[in-house]
Amino acid sequence: MRKYIAIIIASLALFTGQAHGQRCLPKMQGIEVRADMADGFNLGGKDGGYSFGAALSTYTKKGNKWVFGGEYLLKNNPYKDGKIPVAQFTAEGGYYFKILSDARKIVFVYAGASALAGYESVNWGEKVLHDGSTLHDRDAFIYGGALTLDVECYVADRIALLANLRERCLWGGDTFNFHTQSGAGTNFLIH
């Protein structure tokens, strides 16, 4: 009789539905670390751009999430035989909606909107260029928003790889208002 009970228990354990990790539950938090290319990235070129950022993401009902963080973006603008760096330091607050996920809760696709505010520095505040020309663009406080398409792929219960595509629009500065970013990152779930 014990043998039959053991066989029934083993068969129930093997043939019933699988248990999956509990992900994106309300109030779960994660630390996101990202690296992006900005407006295309030409290795060794004069017009490449990149950004680095970190954020705290807090999940809500239905797998949506709030994201609060900071970002550093550097874009080099070509000028004669050199380049003029434009750096942006921004803080972000936004809400991302889960638009797609698989049944096993491994891959999530989010679409989100964020408010951005920060500071822009043109040529690190130096007005005179290397050839004696005067730069009329100035350092300024900037504000605006961003639209983001974000993909999370869980490789473990507390670690997810990120891929994102983002369009930033910022006003208040003297340089370009729009920046397209694409990149990758990691999300470490802490709670």
Q: Which residue stretches match the model-derived regions?
A:
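Surface-exposed extracellular loop regions of Gram-negative outer-membrane beta-barrel proteins
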Residues: 148-151, 156, 160-163
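Gram-negative (and chloroplast) outer-membrane scaffold detector with strong preference
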Residues: 55-130, 159, 188
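Outer-membrane beta-barrel domain signature
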Residues: 52-53, 70-72, 76-78, 120-121, ...
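Outer-envelope beta-barrel architecture signal
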Residues: 23-31, 62-66, 87, 105-111, ...
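Cleavable N-terminal export/targeting peptides
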Residues: 1-28
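Outer-membrane beta-barrel "beta-signal"
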Residues: 92, 178-191
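Short glycine/proline- and aromatic-enriched beta-strand/turn motifs that initiate or cap beta-hairpins
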Residues: 20-75, 187-191
